[in-house]
Amino acid sequence: MNLSLSGRKIAMTRVSAETQYITPIGSPTLDELLKDCDSFRKGDSGDGVKSDDPAHHIIDVEALYVKPVPYVLNFNNLQYDVTLRRRFGFSRQNGVKTLLDDVSGEASDGDILAVLGASGAGKSTLIDALAGRVAEGSLRGSVTLNGEKVLQSRLLKVISAYVMQDDLLFPMLTVKETLMFASEFRLPRSLSKSKKMERVEALIDQLGLRNAANTVIGDEGHRGVSGGERRRVSIGIDIIHDPIVLFLDEPTSGLDSTNAFMVVQVLKRIAQSGSIVIMSIHQPSARIVELLDRLIILSRGKSVFNGSPASLPGFFSDFGRPIPEKENISEFALDLVRELEGSNEGTKALVDFNEKWQQNKISLIQSAPQTNKLDQDRSLSLKEAINASVSRGKLVSGSSRSNPTSMETVSSYANPSLFETFILAKRYMKNWIRMPELVGTRIATVMVTGCLLATVYWKLDHTPRGAQERLTLFAFVVPTMFYCCLDNVPVFIQERYIFLRETTHNAYRTSSYVISHSLVSLPQLLAPSLVFSAITFWTVGLSGGLEGFVFYCLLIYASFWSGSSVVTFISGVVPNIMLCYMVSITYLAYCLLLSGFYVNRDRIPFYWTWFHYISILKYPYEAVLINEFDDPSRCFVRGVQVFDSTLLGGVSDSGKVKLLETLSKSLRTKITESTCLRTGSDLLAQQGITQLSKWDCLWITFASGLFFRILFYFALLFGSRNKRT
């Protein structure tokens, strides 16, 4: 694009939605540029005159150069203390650690406020405090936007975004797909899909991701975008709705100098479009410092400098430690702070000097004459400023340019719950389909397990031994279905952090996520269930025919569903892979012990009976037993077979016949070699299974999966607030 200023005209050549445009302070928003450029591409110059050359147009700057709506974020006297918990009973009393100590500052639209400091200085803590990620009551002080308190405000979540330090993205989605799904979540449903796509395309160019637009994000096992591109995608997700305030926790961490500079360049363009950008950064290069507008340097929670980078040399010169020429001013400042922290007096002298320096600066500002125009601009209320921003194209979630309603009616979420559920399910399925190794691994696991069982339990007969082997088969099959679901642990742990990032600022509802996650998991379990059932049912020789096979398939499917729900719930409560594995395996082991196989229900101590009835393995185990043995025509002990597995088992067949005749005379009941002495119903009674039908057990198994999904919802709702305490 060729830009040349002549009076108030700009010559634009080959304008397109994909053109990168670095806007000056006071420039139009990206949405406005798209609309204006689109009209010029159609040949309308803006004054009703059609141009003959579609590749060259004259744009009136007055139509584009809109004065930005002023926003000022003030934070005063922020104090944040945490109580150090005792690790052991014999340790000393609880102590208190101060993470933020009387920190104040200001951030304006069009500017980047960078928080600097060594590790542990309080950078991330300050960003979290300003973003409302500190639990209510833990933070003292005030945070206001245009004079109105926004700390712990619902409105702050709607108009702001928070970019975490870790780039947590779905690995098998492309850059464009990732941003498009973000637009579906954060932009109102009233906005057409074509408009959302325009926003995504323009954002791709703004982020410098055009060459990587169709490349998958990637992970350890899949080649994808570079680290710098990945970081820019993370930023793009959170600025898709054009937030008024953007918080970033060390966005340049882990990047080389070139990629770090490119990221801050992107942030500069975002700020110049009318947003407040506040970020923490560890040690910026000289090039990055030139892009920053304001600096706050922290030392152990205290502010040792607050001002523009240009005033930093004068500040330290007045302090008596002038910055040498050609020295990186930020590196010098941070090195000096570290030096003072290691001294006996610490940074107290620098903190006191900063307070006096700030007071002198405030006095100079107050004594300087200000125009009424500036005072009028800065006196806009927050609601007026937000409505004005929406009117001029700021894409605030829950609002639209055509209907900039008052902020009381702005929804916390951009879309209804049903739409969120559909988009979440669509995204999950697209990512899952592109990872066939996960599907293949589970199917391969159940195939190998099924084949192993088929060879070990091939064509069981109807003898006492066959009955016992059926019991051991089912005692192995049912818990195996649950243990196979443990492969969900690492997948969901990763998704959990994506969920936290996206719901921190109301991308979608927790209920929408849980419902979509549950619905998508159902078809994933179908193939493993059918494969395992088909292999084991016919080869082992289970009873029931086609009807029995269908029920067996449903039961295996229900067991997979229940096991998946249990593992998902535990993953939501225990966000650590190794601990989650340990808790899941231990819980399933307890359920197996008290399911009724190892210890008969009548033998379970009365104080553990309650666990027997809530064991998730009890009901599928009983269901499969009923499906196999609840047939009065099937006999498992006939005539002389009654002596098998006893001391008389070694007697000859003729001897057993004589013993049977003697027993028949004693009991005065005719017992022959073909007389059925134990049916399947007798085996069920021996196992203590007489209370429920097999269909009751099946529905209870399905219901247990639903119950754990509900628990999973509450675990995310109350246990994943992602706030400091």
Swiss-Prot record:
The keyword Membrane applies. Residues 73-325 form the ABC transporter domain. Belongs to the ABC transporter superfamily. ABCG family. Eye pigment precursor importer (TC 3.A.1.204) subfamily. The chain crosses the membrane at residues 438-458, 473-493, 515-535, 537-557, 577-597, 606-626, 698-718. GO terms for biological process: vacuolar transport. GO terms for cellular component: vacuolar lumen; vacuolar membrane. It comes from Arabidopsis thaliana. This is ABC transporter G family member 19. It comes from the Eukaryota. InterPro entries: AAA+_ATPase, ABC2_TM, ABC_transporter-like_ATP-bd, ABC_transporter-like_CS, ABCG_transporters, P-loop_NTPase. Confers selective resistance to kanamycin. It is a multi-pass membrane protein. WBC19 may be a good alternative as a selective marker of transgenic plants to avoid the use of bacterial antibiotic resistance protein (such as neo/nptII). GO terms for molecular function: ABC-type transporter activity; ATP binding; ATP hydrolysis activity. It is found in: Vacuole membrane. The gene is ABCG19. Residues 419-629 form the ABC transmembrane type-2 domain. Its main location: membrane. The lineage of its organism: Eukaryota, Viridiplantae, Streptophyta, Embryophyta, Tracheophyta. SMART domains: AAA.
